[in-house]
């Protein structure tokens, strides 16, 4: 079973950012990176046309629980904060994402604004300013028309490959660095996307999962027939999907029906449905990196919960203090971060229960 090692709450300094810009219902304006020594975590947040970074301690602390085992955060201070030396956008940033490269000392930061303008920069792994590598890409229509929600995701095997979704345009553009590879036309307004990590797709990351309206569509970037669409799954009519995520074996979707549905990509059949696990609409999902039988669920009502999707059993949860402006999970470990419009940042470090018990035993001189 998973347990929380720590849950911390920090506040964005007013001197750095006083009034964050409002975001879309999909909270994609936050990204996380834990330092190599696990002592602190860099939190990247986007507001308006700029990106900011904050360093928050990751030291273990006593986790307090309230009613119904709700985790109570411990107040902490922001260790460092600054404006990221990232080329500014011309319109409001809608989504940001971090990707790791072959080198262990650098990260890739990508951002996309409401017109689909993509900017990618290389960051120092220690949280220092941007390196010299920066490139940008515009959609084929040069971002004309009405702006709206836009999303970005990097390929897990090729950091240089990124997919950008634009809701109002019903399109997804795929890039290799600043080279436009192809455009996917969706039937409905896309609301979330991710490269699939399933075993059946191998390591080439050619499969892209997209939520559009009440449908989950699967696209093979190597195919031309049907525009590359290889499968469609329809949810409940009228219940919009807001989020999709993938593990090495399964894929999960959630949305307005407050239900997490897990699919087997080998047969495209539903393995499990965790019905009404959230009080309101689900706008964020992530499989646990420790045990993919667990899934993290973010709801509109400030709540974040973790549970076993096979048994529909909640094991832990915490709440923000206002609407989420950004929410994310680290790529290879169970560290969750959320940013509220009050300026509060919540940072949760999750691990296996037996790990906490073993470390407690060692600290008391008793072998586990």
Can you say where each PLM-predicted feature lies in the sequence?
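Beta-propeller domains
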Residues: 1-18, 37-87, 115-136
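Terminal intrinsically disordered, low-complexity extensions flanking WD-repeat/beta-propeller proteins
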Residues: 2-31, 36-42, 59, 301-304, ...
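A common structural microfeature
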Residues: 27-29, 40-42, 48-51, 93, ...
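Structural hallmark of WD40 beta-propellers
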Residues: 39-44, 103-110, 158-164, 182, ...
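Short, flexible beta-strand-to-coil junctions
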Residues: 46-50, 112-116, 165-168, 212-213, ...
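Per-blade loop-tip surfaces of WD-repeat and WD-like beta-propellers in eukaryotic adaptors/scaffolds
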Residues: 57-64, 117-137, 167-192, 199-206, ...
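Alpha-solenoid helical-repeat scaffolds
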Residues: 91-185
């Amino acid at each position: 079973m998973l347990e929380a090692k720590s849950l911390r709450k920090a506040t964005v300094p007013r001197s750095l950012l006083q009034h964050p810009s409002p975001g879309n219902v999909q909270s994609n304006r936050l990204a996380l990176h834990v330092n190599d020594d696990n002592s602190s975590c860099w939190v990247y947040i986007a507001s308006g046309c700029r990106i900011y970074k904050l360093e928050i301690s990751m030291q273990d602390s006593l986790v307090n629980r309230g009613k119904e085992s709700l985790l109570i955060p411990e107040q902490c201070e922001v260790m460092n904060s600054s404006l990221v030396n990232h080329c500014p956008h011309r319109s409001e940033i809608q989504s940001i994402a971090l990707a790791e490269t072959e080198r262990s000392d650098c990260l890739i930061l990508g951002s996309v604004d409401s017109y689909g303008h993509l900017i990618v920069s290389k960051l120092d792994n220690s949280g220092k300013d941007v390196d010299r590598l920066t490139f940008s890409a515009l959609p084929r229509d040069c971002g004309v028309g009405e702006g709206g929600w836009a999303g970005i995701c990097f390929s897990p095997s090729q950091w240089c490959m990124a997919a950008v979704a634009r809701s109002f345009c019903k399109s997804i553009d795929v890039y290799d660095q600043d080279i436009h590879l192809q455009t996917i036309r969706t039937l409905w307004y896309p609301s979330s996307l991710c490269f699939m990590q399933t075993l059946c797709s191998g390591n080439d990351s050619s499969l892209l999962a997209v939520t559009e309206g009440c449908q989950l569509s699967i696209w093979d970037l190597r195919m031309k027939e049907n525009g590359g669409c290889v499968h469609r799954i329809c949810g409940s009519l009228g219940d919009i999907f807001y989020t999709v995520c993938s593990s090495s074996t399964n894929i999960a979707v959630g949305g307005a029906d407050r239900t997490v549905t897990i699919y087997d990509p080998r047969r495209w059949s539903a393995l499990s449905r965790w019905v009404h696990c959230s009080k309101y609409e689900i706008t964020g999902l992530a499989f646990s990196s420790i045990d993919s039988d667990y899934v993290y669920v973010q709801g509109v009502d400030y709540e974040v919960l973790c549970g076993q999707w096979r048994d529909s059993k909640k094991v832990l949860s915490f709440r923000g203090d206002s609407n989420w402006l950004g929410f994310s999970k680290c790529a290879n470990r169970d560290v969750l971060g959320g940013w509220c419009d009050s300026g509060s940042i919540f940072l949760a470090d999750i691990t296996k229960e037996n790990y906490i018990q073993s470390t407690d035993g060692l600290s008391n001189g008793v072998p586990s």
